[in-house]
Amino acid sequence: MVKSYLKYEHAKAFGVVASTSSNIVWIANDRNSTGVGQAVVAANEEVLCWDIKKGELLSRWRDDTCTVPVTCIAQSRTDKDVFAVGYEDGSIRLWDSKISTVIVSFNGHKSAITQLDFDRSGIRLASGSKDTDIIIWDLVAEVGQFKLRGHKDQVTGLRFIEPLAEVQDEDGSRAMVLDGEKSSDGFILSTGKDSLLKLWDLSSRHCIETHISQTNGECWALGVSPGSEACITAGNDGEMKVWSLDVDGLAASVGRVDVATTKHLTDRGTLHRQNKDRALEVEFHPKKDYFAVHGSEKAVEIWRMRTEAEVKKGLLRKRRRRREKQKDPKQNEQEAEEDEGAVDVASADIGDVFVQYVVVRTGGKLRSAAWALPSGQKDLHILVGTTNNQLEYFNVPSKEKNDKKTKQDIPDYTRALSVDLPGHRADIRALSLSSDDKMLATAANGSLKIWNVKTQACIRTFECGYALSCAFLPGDKVVVVGTKSGELQLFDVASAALLDSVDAHEGAIWSLNVHPDGRSVVSGSADKSAKFWDFRIVQEEVLGTKRTTPKLKLVHSKTLKVSDDILCLKFSPDSKYIAAALLDNTVKVFFVDSLKLYLNLYGHKLPVLSMDISYDSKLIVTSSADKNIRIWGLDFGDCHKALFGHQDSILQVAFVPHNADSNGHHFFSSSKDRTIRYWDGDKFEQIQRLDGHHGEVWAMAVAHRGNFLVSAGHDKSIRVWDETDEQIFLEEEREREIEELYESTLTTSLERDGDTADANDEFGAASKQTTETLMAGERIAEALDLGMADLNLMKEYEQAKESNPNAAAPQRHIVFMALGNITAEAYVMSVLQKIKAAALHDALLVLPFASVPMLFTFLNLFAVRSMNIPLTCRILFFMLKTHHKQIVASRAMKAMLDGIRANLRATLKKQKDEMGFNLAALKVVGMQIRENSIKDYVDETWEEENHERSAKKRGFVHVA
């Protein structure tokens, strides 16, 4: 009989405040709230929404089908509940923050999304990626409109520029063109790592201007002022270039052809940051004349734009100094009188206009910063996300307020709030579960945290040294920690106090293990010794009194000296042996009572980093930096099997206790290759691979009942993997892995074929073949074959009925019968409607030209029967564009197209009349409501503005 195993699945992840892969977004609280707002941040593959004031997690956005990290987040300008989130695999998902669900997902880029921006109306989204392309997405039709190519390296900045076209009225006044011949699709400003600054016209879908944005290499950031009249590009060596953008000129150029020589972007000069590393972000304040810029250092620089009066004052001061250096005082007085009136602010150097206001020092290296605009506060507020897993919120007094309070040039900023408790500042190096599996201890550099496993809440935080190992002592009230400096520290969970600290070793304590009888603990160190410590209750005198109080202490009982550094120690569950892994690649097994050598295990080519002994004390499993796992027998020390387990160093192994599925010989291994693997120690087979971490998996802990596993990695996350009731078989797992490998190579080869055709064009189609689109294309082809066969069958039946009215109905395909005896066209339409709008074009590209006549036959039937006309038109026009040359060359298609045109035109005219009638009726109803509700004697323009303000937000329209 084939052996089955129980599957482990990812259940929950916690411990991450904000990951370093993405930017952060500040959003306002609800109107009735008193907080300072919320922070929307990436946490590996999830998006988290934090209340900044309370430090509470409000919502968690997770798509179970997505396992890659989030790389970019953007908020819609119109609907504040809608967020676009870009991922490392090039996919984009639109989330509704109120209900934490995906509205629509797009797939068009080949690599990580670096930039996202919504347009003013909120119905288009621009995305930039590491694959150098920019794609414009239509959020209403849920399709990619087109792709812009031009950058030679990743896109580092992207902003919509949408000037409102102005025309001269007959009376000479200027009026805005909101719609009509003069309105355009707008423009896009983009920067790339290739140091190019490009201005794209979205109407002509081409680049109209290109500039070198940096003099010394790459451009890493782009900031555009709120009015779009200026922008700043920043790159290496602290250099920032200021550009002025002629928005009026852009608006006037709409629809004109003779503007090829006109330059809309002008270089105004260069500013230099205090720090010389590369800039990561430039963020203009939405309402005030400030901008923030930062690199990866522990500081964010806030710059201020001077007022016209200040610039004039500065220029006059400079001229006065220049005159003072001259020798003729009479001439100086005459020039001074002339200069007072003739100061031209436009001629001022850019360094006189933009000045550094304050440098805000942060608690960690910066990853992202965002301006916060809490209601009713006039100061500047900035939210920063750092690389050490925390969010900080700073208050900076504005220039006006600072001038009133003090005469200091540099204002005093304050670190008002932070979100840092729900995570460690550094990588977690050790994990330990309590005996009842309800509490989890995690140790990192500088901190030890105790978590509730069920609620994922952080119960206690202790300050400690650089922790390398930790363990719960029997009773689960005390945790012992071994540090890099050689200290052993005892912490009391209940009182949140440090009980005792012992200078145990001269080197780092790499391993701790509690004796199975629970009365002692052993510590293994880099000072080539293992020390045994007994737990003793000592009566300690209270300072200043004669009273004594009982206190737990560690008392050194004996020492085991070895020839090399000890990296790992383990007691056997039967308390007979203790195994020590040494730096010389060997594992030595000693008797616990006499400390005499029992076995010497040779075989690994690099040091053994971890080991574990099975619960029946018969097997010992060791893992090493040589990527191998070795299973040994503890009776003779023979190597049962060497498994090439991972693609990188194997950091930890742990046996699963006697659970419902195993005999205690199953074990887990974790590695630097970001995976955890589940093994059968008797059959020497890999049972399952657990993917989820986005960095090295430093530590693991298996529950005492074996019903779950906890892992911690370089991505700062703590992940819980639950044992499920689902059974898995080894053959099926191997087949699934091979399928995944095949699918990944299949889609990449398809993409490569598509790229060679139009790689040099500046404008292309926004398409990408994925497994989903390939399967959708196959479903369409299958539906067309079934549908055509059924149409021919029913046609023959109709002909037979003419000669013989009593002819028996034919036996139709079982699919049509199962769906309630529906017609062939209804079945094909149902298949087309089930395909996501974003994937439809790519699915249609899978169809060979031989299937096009069949598809057009059904499109004609859809037009005749008025079945989902928007979808019918969309498919028809896309297929005409794609197969234009073949269709023109085919005689048979011409007659078919004539029929489709006539039927479609009649149906569209009918729908147009219906929509016009309904629109007119809605306008009448709206007028009646307004007449009945507003009774004020006010002018008409105010009434219209008020009505627009009270209108509801637009919802997303699903076409298909």
State where each predicted segment sits.
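WD40-repeat beta-propellers
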Residues: 47-51, 92-95, 134-138, 158, ...
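Conserved strand-to-loop turn within each blade of WD40 beta-propeller repeats
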Residues: 42-43, 86-89, 128-131, 191-194, ...
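Structural hallmark of WD40 beta-propellers
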Residues: 34-40, 79-84, 102-104, 122-126, ...
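Canonical WD40 repeat/beta-propeller blade segments in eukaryotic WD-repeat proteins
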Residues: 18-30, 67-75, 111-117, 153-180, ...
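Short coil/turn linkers that define WD40 beta-propeller blade boundaries
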Residues: 55, 100, 142, 205, ...
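Beta-strand-rich domains and repeat architectures in extracellular enzymes and scaffolds
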Residues: 11-45
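Terminal intrinsically disordered, low-complexity extensions flanking WD-repeat/beta-propeller proteins
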Residues: 3, 13, 239, 248-280, ...
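Short C-terminal beta-strands that terminate individual repeats in beta-propeller domains
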Residues: 10-16, 58-65, 102-108, 144-150, ...
